């Protein structure tokens, strides 16, 4: 049954995250992995667009936050790479398929496999059980968490980057297409941290001032002792409240930790911030989840 039980809904409301084991089958995960392998095999990224992805604030502003390749990726399928995988000329130092940090941000719109997963009847039933009336899909990503050097994701709130008024209207759905364990960089959460508001916002520069972003506010020094790990077996789905604090460590194991994730916004009575880096476009307005 895809709908949440009253006890599951209560736990999500209390913690700001919830694991649903076995939400997707192993076969569905294989289909996603096979399709992403095909997309990677066809990858052709010009030298000047080879952007290393980071969640560290200073590196964000120096790399993807100030490049049009990132800022214009909201309605496209684009590739972002781990740190240290290019030489000074932009050539790969490791096999290209092992260099990718993530693919974003519109797999849900442009690829039939990921569109089918995103809009699957069980996802729609799950989201309905959370009470969302007019959910729209704002972005999607396939995350690789490569073995041996898959980068850490520093503590953050999704609403820092996907801000709405009022708050509390963004929901992440994170699907483990491979086992996500302590050894290979599973997610960590601070339970209940979604009730304290947003401490930092990433703001896009006005269009007439050129591409770029800046941050308003600062990330608190989160107490590491407050984080709890959330290992997830392949096929598990994690619901993530837009304001819950979460992170993941670097993957130093021999195994990747692949996942498909997408974010929804409750469009009813909600204003999507015009300052967000990601904006709907004429080519791709935020598509409704319910079809």
UniProtKB/Swiss-Prot annotation:
Entry EC number(s): 1.14.11.-
Sites bearing Phosphothreonine, chain numbering: 55
InterPro entries: Phytyl_CoA_dOase-like
Cofactor: Fe cation
Chain sites annotated for binding Fe cation: 156, 158, 246
General function of this protein: 2-oxoglutarate(2OG)-dependent dioxygenase that catalyzes the conversion of 2-oxoglutarate to succinate and CO(2) in an iron-dependent manner. However, does not couple 2OG turnover to the hydroxylation of acyl-coenzyme A derivatives, implying that it is not directly involved in phytanoyl coenzyme-A metabolism. Does not show detectable activity towards fatty acid CoA thioesters.
Protein name as it appears in the record: Phytanoyl-CoA dioxygenase domain-containing protein 1
Gene for this chain: Phyhd1
